[in-house]
Amino acid sequence: MASKDVKFAGDARARLLSGIDTLADAVKVTLGPKGRNVVIDKSFGAPRITKDGVTVAKEIELSDKFENLGAQLLREVASKTNDLAGDGTTTATVLAQSIVREGLKAVAAGFNPQDVKRGIDHATTAVIEELRTRTRPIATREETAQVATISANGEVEIGRIISEAVQKVGKDGVITVEEAKGFETELDVVEGLQFDRGYISPYFVTNSEKLIADLENPYILIHEKKLSSLQPLLPLLENVVKSGRPLLSIAEDVEGEALATLVVNKLRGGLKIAAVKAPGFGDRRKAILEDIAILTGGEVISEDLGIKLESVTLSQLGQARRIVIDKDNTTIVDGEGDADAIKGRVGQIRAQIEETTSDYDREKLQERLAKLAGGVAIIRVGGSTEIEVKERKDRVDDALNATRAAVEEGIVPGGGTALARAAEVVARLQFHNDDQRIGGDIVRKALQAPLRQIAENAGEDGAVVAGKVLENGAYNFGFDAQIGEFKDLVAAGIIDPTKVVRTALQDAASVGSLLITTEVLVTEKAEPKPAAPPAGADLGY
């Protein structure tokens, strides 16, 4: 077992604070509309330029193991906030640094760490309640764009694109962010249910210019097994030909004789047909096929359910207004499923999202929910260089997460104002003893830290700006750091999602109050490495 290095009391806390300050000072320069960029050296490829707090935090590893403990614990604050709210990581870091710094001063002055922690927890709960009371729901498309613009560092174009995407796919829709191949940032909205399987054979193409199979008012056969022989399908195919409508076959695979026969019939013009492989694998494939069946009003043809291909009728097939298939994707537009059945399926998927503990499963369930209830939008981020594209993509991700949070929980005035004004609530709180009162004072001071930092990053005196904001009694009155003016922030479109502000404070207080109660640090001792043999030494060969 490796030997350990141990630090106690004041020495331990000083090293911890040094690591926290190093990471926080690197992260907090990015806060606000006039925050600066951080350039990160990568072991491979070009350096990364970013204004995203959590990206900076994740890259910092300190050589001193005791200081690195502090940096790692503060990094946890940023990561947790990012996981829960998707934005607000720099605000959380600034709050945590202030709480830890003031808290360690209180402990050094002889106050009881556990009571100080209780005071911090009590004050944090009161502030979160105040934020919820002051929240108002996001009401207009313009407000959605404003939230996104603020989070994207004031880039109006990003705000407009995200607002448009949210408008088109709804709150249950999925919005993904990708890197574009050109200079422009653009929005691509997928109409209908799309899955990532294209036509099995290019002979199914109906439009040779666009290389797509375009089926109008088709029937849809949804089969979970492979189709190797057409014999069981013949009665159904005859009925489809009589109806004069096209047919899409979705199956695990179509191969051999079955594929050859379908292609020959398609080329002769007797049967308008296309075939695609079923999306997904295993249980997920079964679930997606069931989704498609419910959306199109059909049934999944499965021997497990006692349904055989020979006995399938037209009434068991799905139907849609249109289906478009290219070499990579299939899109079903306006499925003719029963609205109540679709609503029931959506409720079922929502319940599964609530229950699952796996991030991967949650992401896949949300994709399925979007395809049934909302839609899918893709934001393609462009730029002149790869470095610029990556930096913009970071900001688009933050803006998108902030917008989702605003739709979910509402908004409060931005620019650090909502937190600074919540300090009044802490001042009115009752505490059991003086040590807990000190914990409340620590939170009260920390609540001004984001507003001060935003002002300082804009070249102003943070204390003076905070004083002017709090002198004015109007709740929405604050500092617009972009142009250096005091105004009604909500009217000016400077707003923050309540969820982001709340999560930042909760995570900062949680980790910050635990750090205050730290008395001992234990790390592994660095083992001295054996010296390399001198060049040209006799190695005994």
UniProtKB/Swiss-Prot annotation:
Keywords: ATP-binding, Chaperone, Cytoplasm, Isomerase, Nucleotide-binding. It is an enzyme of class 5 (isomerase). It is found in: Cytoplasm. Coiled coil: none annotated. GO terms for cellular component: cytoplasm. Its EC number is 5.6.1.7. It catalyses: ATP + H2O + a folded polypeptide = ADP + phosphate + an unfolded polypeptide. Gene3D superfamilies: GroEL, GroEL-like equatorial domain, TCP-1-like chaperonin intermediate domain. It comes from the Bacteria. SUPFAM superfamilies: GroEL apical domain-like, GroEL equatorial domain-like, GroEL-intermediate domain like. ATP binds at residues 30-33, 51, 87-91, 415, 496. InterPro entries: Chaperonin_Cpn60_CS, Cpn60/GroEL, Cpn60/GroEL/TCP-1, GroEL-like_apical_dom_sf, GROEL-like_equatorial_sf, TCP-1-like_intermed_sf. GO terms for molecular function: ATP binding; ATP-dependent protein folding chaperone; isomerase activity; unfolded protein binding. One of its GO terms (biological process) is protein refolding. It holds the Pfam family Cpn60_TCP1. Belongs to the chaperonin (HSP60) family. Forms a cylinder of 14 subunits composed of two heptameric rings stacked back-to-back. Interacts with the co-chaperonin GroES. Together with its co-chaperonin GroES, plays an essential role in assisting protein folding. The GroEL-GroES system forms a nano-cage that allows encapsulation of the non-native substrate proteins and provides a physical environment optimized to promote and accelerate protein folding. This is Chaperonin GroEL 2. It comes from Gluconacetobacter diazotrophicus (strain ATCC 49037 / DSM 5601 / CCUG 37298 / CIP 103539 / LMG 7603 / PAl5).
